[in-house]
Amino acid sequence: MSYNISLDSLPYFESTYNEEDRSAAAQIVEEELKRSGGLLIKQEEQKKKFQSHRLSDRLENAIVAAGKGEKLAAIDVQRYIQLKPPGTRESLLQSAVVWEYQKSRNDNLYLLEKHGEKAFDSSLEALEVQLELLEKELVNTKKLSQGCNRKRKHYQMEVGARLAEAEVKFGQLLQSSIQCRVATLLS
């Protein structure tokens, strides 16, 4: 009864293992397990027991290579590093536009720092002057409105008096008209 036992290797071991030494070490481990009453777990069972998710092919290949004692291949990061910036016309134009924008922003910040307080004070004074002008216009409009209301009240009173006179005259005319009709009917 022979079990396939793989020995772990050190991850940074530079050379490959000798196959004779590997098989001798595997035999020693197997004999020791039998003597001590330990159980050997088959690799398939071990994978099922300790691996709840599937590893990628690249990672499985790296594990197999490490088990064989091969040196792990490092990731080639040189393809991800650009040593030179892109020199396309569009990128140069875009960087010039951004530089101009940053330059004008820097100038604006400098002007704001140097003259911002004065500009705010003068703007505040201008707002106060406008407030005073609005208050004066409000007072003038209120006076005009009051004058207009006085005139309207005066004309309404005058028209009211005329209307009262007209109603009295109309009542008298109506009364005389009725008296005339009654007199003509009686005669």
UniProtKB/Swiss-Prot annotation:
Q: Which InterPro entries would you find in this protein's record?
A: SPF27
Q: Organism's domain of life?
A: Eukaryota
Its annotated compartments are:
Nucleus
Q: Name the keywords, alphabetized.
A: mRNA processing, mRNA splicing, Nucleus, Spliceosome
Gene Ontology CC entries for this record: catalytic step 2 spliceosome; nucleus; post-mRNA release spliceosomal complex; Prp19 complex; spliceosomal complex
For the biological process aspect of GO, one term held by this record is: mRNA cis splicing, via spliceosome
Q: Which family does it belong to?
A: Belongs to the SPF27 family.
Query: Quaternary arrangement and interactors, per the entry?
Result: Belongs to the 40S cdc5-associated complex (or cwf complex), a spliceosome sub-complex reminiscent of a late-stage spliceosome composed of the U2, U5 and U6 snRNAs and at least brr2, cdc5, cwf2/prp3, cwf3/syf1, cwf4/syf3, cwf5/ecm2, spp42/cwf6, cwf7/spf27, cwf8, cwf9, cwf10, cwf11, cwf12, prp45/cwf13, cwf14, cwf15, cwf16, cwf17, cwf18, cwf19, cwf20, cwf21, cwf22, cwf23, cwf24, cwf25, cwf26, cyp7/cwf27, cwf28, cwf29/ist3, lea1, msl1, prp5/cwf1, prp10, prp12/sap130, prp17, prp22, sap61, sap62, sap114, sap145, slu7, smb1, smd1, smd3, smf1, smg1 and syf2.
Q: Main role? A: Involved in mRNA splicing.
Q: Per its record, how is this protein called by name?
A: Pre-mRNA-splicing factor cwf7
Traced from the root, the source organism's taxonomic lineage reads: Eukaryota, Fungi, Dikarya, Ascomycota, Taphrinomycotina
